[in-house]
Design a protein with these regions (language model features):
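A small-molecule sensor/coupling module
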Residues: 1-24
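Short hydrophobic/aromatic-rich motifs at helix boundaries and adjacent loops
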Residues: 22-25, 38-40
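Phosphate-/nucleic-acid-contacting segments
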Residues: 32-104
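Short helix-to-turn junction characteristic of helix-turn-helix DNA-binding domains
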Residues: 27-31
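Short N-terminal helix-initiation segments at or just after the protein's N-terminus
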Residues: 25-26, 80
Length: 104
C-alpha cells in the first residue's frame, strides 16, 4: 500500500507545472523517508546528482540546476557535502498530494 502511495505522489510531483516546486516537493518527500532533523534543518543524506533529480521530476538537467540555485538563493535548500539540507516547512502542495494519495 505504501509503495502505491509513493508512486502516486511521485507521478503527481512530476506533473506539477513549476520545476522549482517539483524539486522542493520531491526533496521533502525524500526527507519524509530518509531525512534527519538537525539544528540547521532537515538533512537528507542522499547523493542526488542534478541529472538524477531531473529524471525524478521529469525535467532537464540544466533546468534543475537553475531551479536548485533559485531554491538555494531563496533559503529553501542547501548542500552540505553529500547531503541536502531543507529549511523551513514542507510545501503545502505536498500535504495535498499525500492526502489525495491516501484517499486513493
Amino acid at each position: 500500500m505504501q509503495r502505491s502511495r509513493t508512486l502516486v505522489v511521485n507521478m503527481a510531483i512530476a506533473h506539477y507545472p513549476r520545476i522549482d516546486r517539483r524539486l522542493l516537493m520531491l526533496m521533502w518527500h525524500l526527507a519524509d523517508r530518509w531525512g534527519r532533523v538537525t539544528p540547521e534543518g532537515v538533512r537528507v543524506p542522499l547523493r542526488l546528482t542534478h541529472q538524477l533529480l531531473a529524471d525524478l521530476v521529469a525535467s532537464r538537467r540544466p533546468s534543475v540546476t537553475s531551479a536548485l540555485q533559485q531554491l538555494s538563493h531563496e533559503g529553501h535548500i542547501s548542500k552540505r557535502g553529500d547531503a541536502w539540507v531543507l529549511h523551513g516547512e514542507p510545501p503545502t502542495e505536498l500535504y495535498e498530494l499525500g492526502h489525495a494519495a491516501s484517499e486513493g
